[in-house]
Design a protein with these regions (language model features):
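Kelch-like beta-propeller repeat domains
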Residues: 2-385
Length: 385
């Protein structure tokens, strides 16, 4: 504990030494740095420094240092783990956007009679984190309930600096599960949350303002669903929403402003025949509206839906022939991570595309990926942490 405190205080002191008196005046002049505006105690964050400066120093810590910093002392832990601190960092542009990917883990290999190593099991999936600024890769610790891999086809969303993993199939029995897990990047820990009210697979998902929305998909009998629910991350509560006008299996969720778009999908009696329309939930009113011809009929929307410069939905698989198959895109601030293959069975490539419109008008820049992070990407989302 003492070593951790010494390390961080030494770095903070070095940083402060470079600041001029004018910086102190600047901090005092900013109303959002006033300790009186906080509901948690900010005094004595760093002995000998005003609360505002102590807060400024901790605000400048990179998110990767938060797990260790939260163990320095109780006041730091209280601050770093609070939603108030997250919103403060976001307000002054100190948050950081990363891609969280459900990705196949490296397979375990054994020697065969032909002396050619071969895999001993079907692929397991973990959560990979890609930092677009440093171009670095990392992998989250597994969920305690699933130490050998995440539920297959689980869906990801991010709210207020946390990652939410919902549903999927048990990796051993292949039975659909209702599990919900929340990962806190500050503590580097998973927490079991309240289960999804009912089993559903291949549903649309999106998040906004601390809530995660799910709609459509199919139940354990393979019947398509038109029901929708919203999960409040802070309250750990599920609330049922008004149903969509029709069933939508294998639909795709997209957040556009204050609207949750459920794109395409198909009905129970039309297995695999993807429809052209979309249904849009207006978050303010809680009402659904239909958007006819919003998507190309017969085209699977899973994980490849983007928004073009003209506001219309586009398929990221059409950006370049290199990503036409198994396409997955994650918007990351000023760019988009795009993953895909040139043809069925070929290895996936990882690219950054310019702009937030999925690279519609920009070229793809191929990313160098370490072997352990080159596995198949099933889905993903952006987390602002």
């Amino acid at each position: 504990m003492q070593n951790n405190a010494s390390f961080f205080l030494a770095n903070i002191t070095s940083s402060l030494a470079a600041k001029s008196t004018s910086c102190l005046i600047c901090f005092a002049a900013k109303p959002h740095f006033s300790a009186k505006m906080w509901s948690i105690e900010l005094t004595d964050l760093i002995p000998g420094l005003p609360a505002e400066l102590g807060l400024e120093c901790l605000t400048r810590l990179p998110y990767s240092a938060h797990p260790v910093a939260s163990r320095v002392c109780s006041p730091w832990r209280t601050l770093l783990e609070s939603q108030e601190f997250y919103h403060h960092r976001k307000k002054i542009a100190r948050t950081h956007k990363v891609a969280c990917l459900v990705q196949a883990l490296p397979r375990k290999l054994v020697a065969s009679e032909s002396d050619v190593p071969k895999s001993t099991e079907s692929p397991s999936f973990g959560i990979t984190v890609f930092d677009p600024v440093s171009r670095s890769w990392d992998r989250l610790d597994p969920v305690p309930q699933y130490p050998n891999g995440m539920p297959l086809f689980c869906q990801l969303a991010s709210c207020e600096g946390k990652l939410v993993a919902i549903g999927g199939w048990d990796p051993v029995s292949y039975s659909p599960v209702t599990d919900v897990f929340v990962y806190d990047f500050t503590t580097s820990r998973w927490k079991k949350a309240n289960d999804m009210p009912s089993k559903r697979s291949f549903f649309a998902i999106g998040s906004d303002a601390g809530r995660v929305y799910v709609a459509g998909g199919h139940d354990e009998n393979k019947d398509a669903l038109k029901s929708a629910w919203v999960y409040d991350v802070r309250l750990d509560e599920w609330t049922e929403l008004t149903q969509m006008s029709q069933e939508r299996d294998e639909c795709q969720g997209v957040m556009i402003g204050s609207e949750f778009w459920v794109v395409s999908g198909y009905r129970t009696e039309s297995q695999g025949v993807f429809e052209a329309g979309a249904e849009v939930l207006e978050l303010g009113s809680g009402r659904w509206r239909l958007e006819d011809e919003a998507w190309e009929a017969g085209h699977c929307p899973r994980h490849c839906v983007g928004v073009g410069e003209d506001g219309r939905l586009v398929s990221r698989g059409e950006l370049d022939s290199a990503v036409r198959v198994g396409t997955c895109g994650v918007i990351l601030g000023g760019g988009t991570l795009v993953v895909g293959s040139e043809y069925q069975g070929s290895s996936q490539g990882f690219y950054m595309a310019e702009g937030t419109k999925g690279g519609q008008n920009g070229k793809l820049d191929r990313i160098s990926v370490p072997d352990e992070f080159s596995g198949f990407v099933q889905s993903g989302c952006c987390a602002e942490i």
